[in-house]
Amino acid sequence: GHFPKDKSDLSNEACRTRLSDKPEGEIPETMFHHLRRNGYYTVGIGKISHYVDGCLYDYEAPKTDKPELPYSWDEMLFDAGKWGNGWNAFFGYADGSNRQSHKKQVKPYECADVADEGYPDGLTANLAVKKIKELTTKNEPFCLAVGFFKPHLPFTSPKKYWDMYEESSIPISPMP
């Protein structure tokens, strides 16, 4: 590993400012890059690090295909579903709306009566199941990294999961 050389190395922008647009030998090697370089087939699905779908773009900017972790992945997969792109899915609600469509005035949680695929993490889980079934049929080592959005605001999931807990039995933290 490497120690941070600059305070910018500690921010969420480190991948954008320190890794992207640089030749392979000039950047720190990620674990996934190391595995890939040593014969593993590497697949990333979902939110592996800061950016929601593995590509560098801001919430209100057009989507790009510029990788957040260059040289790390043989495949980087994400299903944005009805939300259209990663950031909209990250802040998405079951009806397909998102933080942007609500002018950033959003409720902190939602529990719609929908299937798992009614929220982005269900789509991510489906991709992961499909991909691991495919990878296990090949005769090569692989690394499958899967990142889910939750827990993160907004706290959204299908109602069946909320119904597993009695709200009154959950203690409220004394620290707000």
Please describe what each predicted stretch is.
Residues 1-176:
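Formylglycine-dependent sulfatase
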